[in-house]
């Protein structure tokens, strides 16, 4: 598994700051929330995955470049 550099992680943190609201458009995972489910980005982990708290109660992470999602509202909390 390839882990992103510190610079790449920092770029993801700027692109998806804590509090950013996202909407799931598609995810190839049997545990995925339904398409259209919205959630809040809680942070970015060391693997470059977005830690998301979904409105369904799930906390499944998003993988930028693999999962399909859109930003609904940009966050700004640190």
Where do the protein language model's features map onto the residues?
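Basic/aromatic-rich interaction segments and small domains that mediate binding to polyanionic partners
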Residues: 2-77
């Amino acid at each position: 598994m390839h882990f992103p550099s510190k610079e790449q992680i920092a770029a993801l943190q700027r692109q998806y700051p804590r509090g950013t609201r996202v909407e799931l458009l598609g995810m190839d995972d049997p545990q995925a929330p339904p398409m259209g489910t919205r959630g809040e980005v809680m942070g970015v982990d060391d693997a470059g995955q977005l830690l998301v708290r979904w409105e369904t109660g799930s906390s499944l992470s998003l993988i930028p470049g693999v999962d399909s999602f859109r930003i609904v509202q940009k966050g700004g909390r640190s």
